[in-house]
Amino acid sequence: MSEPLLQIKNLQKKYPIYGPLGKMFPPVNHMRAVADVSLELHEGETYGLVGESGCGKSTTGRSILGLVKPDSGEILYKGKDLTKLSDAQFRPLRADLQMVFQDTLSSLNPRSRIGQLLEEPMIIQNIGTPEERRQKVLDILTMVGLSEEHYFRYPHELSGGQVQRLGIARAMIINPKLIICDEPVSALDVSIQSQILNMLTRLQKGRNLSLLFISHDIGVVRYISHRIGVMYLGTLVEEADTEELFTNTLHPYTQALFASVPDFERKERKVSLTGELPQYTDQFKGCVFHTRCPYATDKCRECAPAMKEVCPGHRVACHRVEG
């Protein structure tokens, strides 16, 4: 396999927890939002990052673009560590790295017309003449299933599905290599979700795009992804090619996550979650899942399992699984 387009190595991000008097005193603890996450994304590949809300998947995605500054770890894009770059050094790479947000409408200037919103990234990157930029905007509108008449409209005049198409168009207008899709279809109904996913797949194949697709929806992630990473409490607990993960699910949390989806054709291995979701702070010990895992042992409560490869491309962090 070719060299990865993107490599994340041992990414860490914590947020301070302050006492009753707030920031007058040092933090009393730290919440681990992302804990030692490592993954790779190849050219033309879709990597699905799935997990419950608050598991750190969005923080991981935003760290790639510098929207969140990690505490430690490496984010290598074409071998260059993005965490070590200044704003001036990062700026030329922004054309390669784009994002589609869950709430696209709130990320757009409501006073700008759609044509202006799509031209703006090209102006910032000094791409083309005014006429060339206008033509490219019209082309991208057609490509994402909007019409030329939308050029003069405002974002609030669009439906939910059209707004997401606009978000994808804005991300693609300067021909990026990697797009981070953060819950891009979660607010849409199922029929519109299908249209957006099919469009993303078509555009990806046509442009050899790499996608980091972040979602809490197992079905959506399975549909669009070549490989999937499962996150729980800031930790990557299992990773495999899509079909391998769904036919050979190993981590108890992944099994429970899959079992929560109705009619999933996996009735033979159902794991129900018990216990409370813990606070993943600096004082937390052991496996992140031990408070809710039906198979937890003393070893699980004392020692965090290392991520190990159980077969080519399939990694899992669980003491029960032999490497």
Residue ranges and their predicted role:
Residues L65:
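Helix-to-loop junction immediately C-terminal to a conserved catalytic motif
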Residues P4, I17-F25, H30, D241-G323:
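Short catalytic/signature loops enriched in Gly
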Residues D81, E131-E149, F258:
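Conserved ABC ATPase "signature" region
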Residues I173-K177:
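A short, proline-enriched helix->beta-strand linker immediately N-terminal to the Walker B motif
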Residues Y154-L158, Q162:
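Conserved ABC ATPase signature
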Residues G73-D81:
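Conserved ABC transporter NBD signature motif
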Residues I180, P184, L188, I192-E268:
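P-loop NTP-binding/switch modules centered on Walker-like glycine-rich loops
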